[in-house]
Amino acid sequence: MKYELVAGFETHIELATDTKIFCSCSTAFGGAPNSHCCPVCIGLPGTLPKLNKKVVEYGIKAGLATHGKIANISKMDRKNYCYPDLSKAYQISQLYAPLTIGGYVELSSGKKIRLHHIHIEEDAGKLIHSHGDTYVDYNRGGVPLIEIVSEPDIRYIDEAREYVEKLQQVMRYIGISDCRMQEGSMRCDVNISVRPEGSEKLGTRTEIKNMNSISNIMKAMEYEYERQVDLIENGGKVVQETLRYDDATNTTSSMRSKEDAHDYRYFRDPDLVTICVTDEEVEEIKSTLPELPTEKYKRYVSEYGVPEKDAQLLTKYRNISEYFDKAITDLKKPKTASNFIIGQMFRILQTEEDKEAFDVKTTPEQLNELCKLIEGGKVQNNLAKSTLDKMLESGKPCTEYISEEDMAGLDDSFVDDLCRQAIEANPKAVEQYKQGKEKAIMACMGYVMKNSKGKANAQDVLEKIKSMIS
Amino acid sequence: MGYIEKIQSMLQNGEISCVELTEKYLKAIEEANGELNAYVTVTPEVALEQAKQVDEKIKRGEKLLPLEGVPMTLKDNISTNGIETTCCSKILKGYKPIYDAKVWAILKKNNAILLGKTNMDEFAMGSSCETSCFGGATNPFNTDHVAGGSSGGVASAVGGDIAVFGLGSDTGGSIRQPASFCGIVGLKPTYGAVSRYGLVAYASSLDQIGPITKTVEDASLVYDVISEYDENDSTCEGRQGEPTYDTLNNDIKGMKIGIAREYLEGVREDVKEAVLEAARKYEEMGAEIVYFDLPALKFALPVYYILACAEASSNLGRYDGIRYGYKTEHYEGIHDMICKTRSEGFGEEVKRRILLGTYVLSAGYYDAYYKKAQNLRGTIIKAFDDAFKNVDVILAPTVPMTAFKSGEATSDPVETYLTDICTVPINIAGLPSVSVPCGFNKNGMPIGMQIIGDKFKEGKILNVAYKYEQACPENFKDTKWGVKL
Ligand SMILES: [Zn+2]
């Protein structure tokens, strides 16, 4: 029998606000233990939380960017559990009335992974084990998080990867988090169950907690899928439990079963007032959002004729797409600029971090200038490429490297003349071309390129000659 | 004239220096505290340093700020930077906060003289002050009797004249009940009128700080100072409208004073009689007494104990021995450490309420208890809202009885919970209420009545209370203790 994977995600994302969610301590990563702390975030008796408005704003941005509905009224709840890294013995979170409801993440296939909701909450501190003792560092305690809870819509491990990458991409675009899994600013819990293909009923699910890299998520899901299928095929039953993934052994192991699952005793936090957000405020925040990657991607492919694969690369990071958008403002063929970015520029931006930062010496305006020379038929592609390489190294404009002479005489009428001459000089080749021998036309091309000293645009020339013959 | 104004004029006229005055109070504490057990921490260094500053100010010819130079005390659940704040619990013994509660910050800025921290029921859970790990405070009218709770220490200190005023906290009657037992004035402000920042939480949606004083004027003066907006407490709006002091002496002719029949049920005869006598006094002053029904009151006690315990179970989770306070000596591993620390550090009543609160919030019981109690809270709020459409204030007994003898309260917890029946509805509805002495029983123990107002109508209830004080000064009696000015 074939088994279908059913998976859903709970993704925690640390928000890039300057200060914590309920006090004015810094959220900066690192720092000496307990140096970013105050009476509020270490939960001293009598202290009270004060909600950071930026956290609400960022949460709303996340909701809007994933097509969710922003709740006009939402509330903070207490999630009670006792652990040394949690200074108040409860986490302030949202359960009964979260900030945003619904929404989806669209995969490249067009499939939509629906979201249940997004809520805001505080992070806990960290335990540090050293010399046989355990210490607590509350620097991370009170750092704002959003938790994005998806519906169990994922059916393939590749979809899981794309879902996480898309979330990362969108959250970075809207500037609310750097989503660095290795630093813990993005963490995923995955709910997994399997069921016979064609079945509508959900199987018993397990939850793999706190995964901190995409490759671990994929490996853990693969392992857990196999484990559950094996179990069922051998007459066993999946037990509802919380699992931990160990990447050294590539296995999952039980953290706790359903029986000893926490009872969090959620209730409304009486120290915080209702969060009221008006439709006008939502609209205002919406107007500050940049164009989102999926929309950009669609625009590049359908309006600009950029190949899908290239459009994906261009939209992967906000800096690249914004550079591209600036470079192509008045170009007839944006694809020229796209080719330069993915060809020339990506060659010098090798790591993902470099690409994300997209810190190149050539300004988008300078790239635009170069592309316009090509469009005007003043510069041929090969020359432009080598020129761009030099520009990227020096930061100087293309006019530094392409002389007036290089560009002279290459106006359209001059090329037209050359084409006419080429046809006259190669009657035999023209005849052959007319009879269907496509390649024969290369003889005429050669003539034009040679007499223009290689400066003519090959593509233009080809089209010109073809139209003159027919 | 209240005691605060009297002291400030004495200071300003040079009749006594602030240091002399403070020393007088410190000496009186030394003499009386052995029997009253009102103070758990005395802070002579802080007090005398503050007093010196006040004297210098007077010497420079500067005018005193409100409450400046007036010796006072804070309940031991109000955080004081560098000064032990224990909530009278073993689990917080030795704990010195590193920040000031908002109310203490205000009083400090105004140079009110802090004599020390006063006794209370452990974490404010109790009606007799006897759940304190330091033993209970006693009643200045008769030390065989309790001072009441939970702010028993403040009431005992103010009633015994070893503080001019004090700040207590009231979650289900903890200001008004001990004030009533000790024959003095206790104001529980509207929820949100005074910042809770720095008040060690018992039940956050019910807790409110307020003054305990000997006269209504004093309560008004203190309230006007502490009812400041505080951005650190999201639920705090501060005082609404003009200072209550400005309207104390307003005419109450034609005012409608409501008496809810339910409030007189199950109340001891002498208490009931004293309250009705007060009502007659008001009629003489031209007010109209309106009897009405408030059936929602019968839900108040169960609603209170469910909500208060639920919030307490969460608020008190942080006392685990890791960061501050008491920590058990011998343990194996973190789980054992937390269990032993809490088992040894909390007293019986606190444990009982944590267990109760944990139970009503747990999966499977939440709907039946907590959620239902929340809904009923809405019903009670609405009932009071409706009542205030027809009356200006409500008159009621503060406690169904007078101060009981020490040891009587601890025997049956449910019986003790019943003594809160008149006070808890006010916390549930978030309303202001002031308890005022209105007579004595045949054994000379004080009886108190409360004047309840609509939200943020502190001005009105203090006005009504002041008029009574003017008419019946005989009910405001001194005891044999303390400083006589
Ligand atoms: Zn902090």
Language-model features: locations:
Chain A
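Amphipathic alpha-helical core segments of compact helical bundles
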Residues: 195, 226, 321, 342-350, ...
